[in-house]
Amino acid sequence: MSRRRQNDEEDEIQMKRRRGAPLIGDVEKKLQEVIGKVGDKNTGSSIEANLEKLTAFLHDDLEKYRSSIIDIVAGCAIYLPNRVTVYTTLVGLLNAKNFNFGGDVVEKLIAEQQDLLLKQKYQEAQNLAIFLCDLGNSGVLTAQSIGEYLESFIAAAFEENMPQVRNDYYIQTVLRCLPWIGKELTEKAQEQMENIVEAVGKYLEMRNKNHVPLLRVWREGSTDQEQEDYLESLSAQIENLRTANWMQNHIPRYYNTFEAVLQDALQHNLPSFSSPEHTSDMIYPYPLVVFRLFQDADCGTDSQLPSGHSIDRFLFEGEISWIIEKNQFNRKSCARELLAFADENPTAPVGFLIFETIFGQMLRLPHAPYPAIFHCSLVLELLKLKPNDYPNILCKTVDLIFSRADSMQPICIDRMVDWFSFHLSNFQYRYTWDEWKDCISNDEFSGRQVFLREVIEKCRRLGSYEKIIAALPSDFVKIHPASPEIRYLLDEEDAMSQRAETFTQMFQERQPADAFLKELKSTDENDELPYNINEFGVFVTVMLKMASKTYSHNFSALFRYKDTLKTVCDAAEQYQEKLLETLYSCWKSNQQMLMILTDKLLKMQIIDCSSVVGWLFDEKMWQEHNRQWLFEVLNQALEKLTRQINVVEKDIKDLTEKVESKEKVTEAGDVKMEEETVVDEKLKGEMEELENHKEKLDRMVSFQRNLFNDFLIAFVEEIKSAATNTSEMDGSGDVGGSESSKFLWLRGRFCHVLLAHAETLLKHSSSIAEEVFSEGADPNISECFNQFQSLRF
């Protein structure tokens, strides 16, 4: 047979195969496509009609591709929560035609839910709970068994000696299911429904709510909208819905169209929920406080804003949040889908809810769910797509937040500063600045003045100094940032000027590190330090002055004289303190340079975290504690240490797995005799390395714990001092004690530190409680720490 004829026959066989049964992968792709698109509203026909066609299409091949169809439906249930009722209707229609299929779907979903909970994917597991409950509306599951299923969640929440955050999650899951299944349970499983309502009420009564003040964006009583705990708010919304006989207009119930078919279908019983065993390494979602910004009067539109305790408000926010989550890596598609959602719901001012949700996420405590740059770019994209309406909504948003800034948590002010400065940089820093000039006369710890001052400073970092000053009204001169130039304080009359000239000449001659070390050697026999500390300060001053032209020049100087700096700084802690003091003295008016160089010194291991923290909380630096840059540097240093510990922990985990794997191989006798010695040597080496890593981790964790304790003690002392010494002289106004703006600001910064490093500090909470908050601690500050501890209570 010729090669050409053979190839032709093979091609013919391939073509026949393609015309015949398609490959499994192709079938799955086609199924995924048709099932995934059944809820699309732009197909030219109704969703009900699409469901009917899809049911007929799937039923024909149900036995052949059952497993694939079930997997795809399960994926839709988990990852498309906005189409719950679409897919529960589909499952209901298929169950009416094939009873076993409905049972297989339920079995698959139950298994998936358990797996998701074990993987700590709590949102996805909650999506499945809602889906399973809604199957009761589409004739797949009995109302009685769904009631028992929800009761088992409540039973899990009442288990003893469990973290409250775990119990909260199970109660929240029950409450989130009720908008879908509440009416059905009330009509067909009244006893279970009453048990659920009673148990939820009992749980909320006995629940600890210490965390609520700490997670509020604004201090209690400072706004006309209550900042409620998320469970309390959802419970009130559900109670109002129940009072209204479960009537709401947001959830589309496609199964009602097929009631005649679905009501005759055989139903399955949903097994009771079995909660995974709790272990100490399980991390549950933090509690939340509901963010509210707008009331109906703020919107000024014909459509009415749902009230805070309306279930529609919850459902709108949930759908907006899901659209953002789904598109968190694509701002353009996110903005388009948000606008499409607003167009689909003309009866409500969805634009206001979109901005309220975005800023609620941006200001969420303890952590925002997405990087700041995503929210920044999403807002810009929304303004671009809706230029006639959304800029006005954004202006109202900013004005409302600014008007409440005096009672705002400092950590939230920081986030608003970061967003607003970035936003203004896209509009040449133009804004209605004159409307805010009244806050310039406020004291320097006033939240509104801090916000305005820090926004201007951040804008200066993003643009030129001259451009920022030109954009500001003349009234703002009091809070203008200083010109960002280096401060060189050595002149001819200075006693150290001669030494400065010597160092300048040595730098120009590019002399080696040894020459500088020799020059810095102390000549005083009574000096306990090996190097003259004042001359070291002069050396650093001259180096920074000569390298002050650009960031690159500064980096180059640090790398060139790294050996000199490191040798001196390793000799004693005082040299690290002197280096940082000199750096601050030179670059005080350029906070960005100060932050970048401090970070670079940490990365080069010339200084360590403890020296940075000690410097920032030295009494001489208290004057800077109303500035954002200081806490940015602090958090950078502490996060760097935490990351280093995380790396060592990962190394230990990897080494442990290696050692255990080799031990199993050795014990099983799978190693050849001639290779046994080599394997034993490798195992011994890895075990020694593992022990060394464990010892290193113990040292690092101990260092971290002591560092947090020391600086928190220093911070508490400063706050206590602020409570007793506030006066007009220190910029804190004429109100003294714990009501002064300075005290409230510093206490807010204390909460900021706790929240920014929540995961780490919660591990050391018992040590902090013992070392920092012993007898005699200020109750105002102790209360902050008690609230913090309840986050994982």
Curated annotation (Swiss-Prot):
Subcellular localization: Nucleus
Q: Write the record's keywords in alphabetical order, separated by commas.
A: mRNA capping, mRNA processing, mRNA splicing, Nucleus, RNA-mediated gene silencing
Residue ranges of every copy of the MIF4G domain listed in the record: 28-242
What processes in GO biological process is this protein linked to? 7-methylguanosine mRNA capping; mRNA export from nucleus; nuclear-transcribed mRNA catabolic process, nonsense-mediated decay; primary miRNA processing; RNA splicing
| InterPro entries reported for this sequence | ARM-type_fold, CBP80, MIF4G-like_typ-1, MIF4G-like_typ-2, MIF4G-like_typ-3
Q: Does the keyword Nucleus apply?
A: yes
Annotated Gene Ontology MF terms?
mRNA binding; RNA cap binding
Asked whether the UniProt record includes Nucleus among its keywords, one would answer yes
Q: Give the matching SMART domains.
A: MIF4G (SM00543)
Q: Which is one Pfam family of this protein?
A: MIF4G
GO CC terms in record: nuclear cap binding complex; nucleus
Q: Which domain of life is it from?
A: Eukaryota
Q: Which PANTHER family match?
A: CAP BINDING PROTEIN, NUCLEAR CAP-BINDING PROTEIN SUBUNIT 1
Q: Which family does it belong to?
A: Belongs to the NCBP1 family.
Q: What does this protein do?
A: Component of the cap-binding complex (CBC), which binds cotranscriptionally to the 5'-cap of pre-mRNAs and is involved in various processes such as pre-mRNA splicing and RNA-mediated gene silencing (RNAi). The CBC complex is involved in miRNA-mediated RNA interference and is required for primary microRNAs (miRNAs) processing. In the CBC complex, ncbp-1 does not bind directly capped RNAs (m7GpppG-capped RNA) but is required to stabilize the movement of the N-terminal loop of ncbp-2 and lock the CBC into a high affinity cap-binding state with the cap structure.
What quaternary structure, including any partners, is listed in this protein's UniProt entry? Answer: Component of the nuclear cap-binding complex (CBC), a heterodimer composed of ncbp-1 and ncbp-1 that interacts with m7GpppG-capped RNA.
Q: What is this protein called?
A: Nuclear cap-binding protein subunit 1
The organism encoding this protein is: Caenorhabditis briggsae
Q: What is the lineage of its organism?
A: Eukaryota, Metazoa, Ecdysozoa, Nematoda, Chromadorea
